[in-house]
């Protein structure tokens, strides 16, 4: 499975033990006693620090030894979701306020996880493109403040990377796992299908964030790796090798694309006054104090306002980016989520969180309608309405001119599947939970025969406290 570069503390400890367990062991939710004989429930906390908000994904997992051999050793039984706004990048001038913004999420997690399970519940916070785009040391200052809050949360913070900026390609990979886990395309309880993952059963995942966009899929034809060198990720997923095609395009997220497209239409002299002009908004309309990456802009509509003009500029931006043609996916349904889903929902292309199937041409048709609206029609108080013409036009151009899908390309838009969010959070939670539980099981197995129970307890206390004293401590008792 794809594991985070986990705690130096635990990895070193695990290496020193040199133990291979014959059975995976899990912390039981009922009494907190480690065993591998009974159905167990345990938790993992993932905090998604995105460009527009910070989201808690708290997962309650269940492990049933009776069915674990059929594929995945545990499954999500329940997801708790909560979001706070704005995103961490909005606190660039006050890092301590960024840490304070997490408190409602941490309080919710403390409420949901039994107290005796806190130290057995791993927590991780991953920031995405919003922080990547901050200048200078601003991102580091925010992360330092946030890290202190996470490490003092009462949960198990996996040193040293419990808090960091997630590489864009990891977003894509974890999102792909979440999607395919929820759709049961990798493992299924249906005996006629089999329990071994296969490329032809999996689906492609397209994620559109604020600062970047990601695509990930499992190619049937591995020639694509020769055409696009560097887009390959070899993954071990619960003992099965998977070779994924994945890439993240920084600057092609929806909010970042807005600024890039607006700048293409605006003369440098006008732009220097923090004024931007766009044919994607009607003449006479002005959007004041729009903020992105700590800069404020006034956006002005144009007399050339139309879908054709807006599309022309948008297409120029998309074609100048690194988005590539994906022949293998043509005609096959691909799954779109995040801002893809949100803008489709705003436009009435789908209804409700379950989403639905559409064709690419419907994004174009929705964009044409949005681009015909007059000044009074877009000034209705909705934060997305003034941008609807540009956003829908960009999404259409990204898929049509970037990935070069035809207008009849089938698209599946999803926000939730089986009542759970489609995001990279669940994929990361599986990786984090499995790494944590395997390490805990190995330590417990290795020390179960230790005659001095006080020594065993002290080692676990050191592990849970996150102190690097455990290394020197273990060297002492190894002599």
From Swiss-Prot:
Catalytic center residues: 171
Cytoplasmic side: 1-7
Induction, as annotated: By stress such as high temperature or ethanol.
GO BP term, example: GDP metabolic process
Keyword Coiled coil carried by entry: no
Transmembrane region(s): 8-24
Enzyme class per UniProt: hydrolase
Subcellular location: Endomembrane system
One annotated Gene Ontology cellular component of this protein: cytoplasmic vesicle membrane
The keyword Lyase belongs to this UniProt entry's keyword annotation: no
Enzyme Commission number(s) of this protein: 3.6.1.6
Glycosylation sites: 300, 452
Named cofactor requirement(s): Ca(2+); Mg(2+); Mn(2+)
One GO molecular-function entry: UDP phosphatase activity
Keywords: Calcium, Glycoprotein, Hydrolase, Magnesium, Membrane, Metal-binding, Signal-anchor, Stress response, Transmembrane, Transmembrane helix
Membrane topology of the entry: Single-pass type II membrane protein
Segments on the Lumenal side according to the record's topology features: 25-479
Function: Hydrolyzes UDP and GDP but not any other nucleoside di-, mono- or triphosphates. May promote reglycosylation reactions involved in glycoproteins folding and quality control in the endoplasmic reticulum.
PANTHER family associated with the record: ADENOSINE/GUANOSINE DIPHOSPHATASE (PTHR11782), NTPASE, ISOFORM F (PTHR11782:SF127)
Entry's family note: Belongs to the GDA1/CD39 NTPase family.
Name of the molecule in the record: Nucleoside-diphosphatase uda-1
Organism the protein comes from: Caenorhabditis elegans
